[in-house]
């Protein structure tokens, strides 16, 4: 299931960098993290859903690439984001 529009808007409002920001790395990572969390819960009850598991792995890879990009352009924004989202060490 895709994210509900209201939840998506809430995440965009929380992580945006300027008024009309919807595509900054921070927003994209936040949206991907929400979808990853949803799918992780889904797999707790649907253990044999291998088709969706592949989609989850693609989302995790996409988030990893965005985080790597963010780390190369601005270390401070990267650290702030991972602290806010509660990912990484």
UniProtKB/Swiss-Prot annotation:
HAMAP family xrefs = Ribosomal_uS15_B (MF_01343_B)
Q: What does this protein do?
A: One of the primary rRNA binding proteins, it binds directly to 16S rRNA where it helps nucleate assembly of the platform of the 30S subunit by binding and bridging several RNA helices of the 16S rRNA.
Which SUPFAM superfamilies does this UniProt record tie to the protein?
S15/NS1 RNA-binding domain
Native source organism of the sequence = Anaeromyxobacter dehalogenans (strain 2CP-C)
Which GO terms of the cellular component aspect does the record hold? cytosolic small ribosomal subunit
Name of the encoding gene: rpsO
The record's similarity note reads: Belongs to the universal ribosomal protein uS15 family.
Leader peptide range in chain numbering: none
- This one is known as Small ribosomal subunit protein uS15
GO MF term list:
rRNA binding; structural constituent of ribosome
GO BP term, pick one = translation
Enumerate the Pfam families for this protein: Ribosomal_S15 (PF00312)
- Domain of life the protein comes from: Bacteria
Self-association state and partner proteins as the record states: Part of the 30S ribosomal subunit. Forms a bridge to the 50S subunit in the 70S ribosome, contacting the 23S rRNA.
């Amino acid at each position: 299931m895709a994210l509900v529009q209201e939840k998506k808007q809430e995440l965009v409002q929380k992580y945006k960098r300027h008024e009309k920001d919807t595509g900054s790395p921070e927003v994209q990572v936040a949206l991907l993290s929400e979808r990853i969390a949803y799918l992780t819960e889904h797999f707790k009850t649907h253990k044999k859903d291998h088709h969706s598991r592949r989609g989850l792995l693609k989302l995790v890879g996409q988030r990893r690439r965005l985080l790597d990009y963010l780390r190369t352009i601005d270390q401070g924004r990267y650290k702030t984001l991972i602290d806010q989202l509660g990912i990484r060490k």
